[in-house]
Amino acid sequence: SQAALAVNISAARGLQDVLRTNLGPKGTMKMLVSGAGDIKLTKDGNVLLHEMQIQHPTASLIAKVATAQDDITGDGXTSNVLIIGELLKQADLYISEGLHPRII
C-alpha cells in the first residue's frame, strides 16, 4: 500500500539523514553513549551502523547492506546509505507523480 511504502522510504531517509553529515574530510563526528555511560566519538559509518539500535526493518536491511559493503571492501558504508536514500527519494517523487512502483 501507499502508506507502507511511505513509511519504508521515511525510515531509509532517516538513516540517510543521520549519516549524511559524516561523509568526506569535513564530516562531523557523532557521539555514541553506551548503556554503561561509555562515550565513543566517530564519523565511521560502519561503526555507527553497528552501534545504532535500528528498529525499523527497512532501515535495518539498509544498514546490513552498508556494513556488508564495508566488511568486503573496507569502506563505503556511509556512501551506500546515502545512495540508497537518494534512490528512494527519487522513487518517491516518481510514485507521487503516478508512476507504478514496479516500473521503477
From Swiss-Prot:
Keywords: ATP-binding, Chaperone, Cytoplasm, Hydrolase, Magnesium, Metal-binding, Nucleotide-binding. Belongs to the TCP-1 chaperonin family. It catalyses: ATP + H2O = ADP + phosphate + H(+). It is found in: Cytoplasm. Its EC number is 3.6.1.-. This is T-complex protein 1 subunit zeta. It comes from Sus scrofa (Pig). ATP binds at residues 24, 76, 78. One of its GO terms (cellular component) is chaperonin-containing T-complex. Component of the chaperonin-containing T-complex (TRiC), a molecular chaperone complex that assists the folding of actin, tubulin and other proteins upon ATP hydrolysis. The TRiC complex mediates the folding of WRAP53/TCAB1, thereby regulating telomere maintenance. ADP binds at residues 24, 76, 78-79. GO terms for molecular function: ATP binding; ATP hydrolysis activity; ATP-dependent protein folding chaperone; unfolded protein binding. It comes from the Eukaryota.
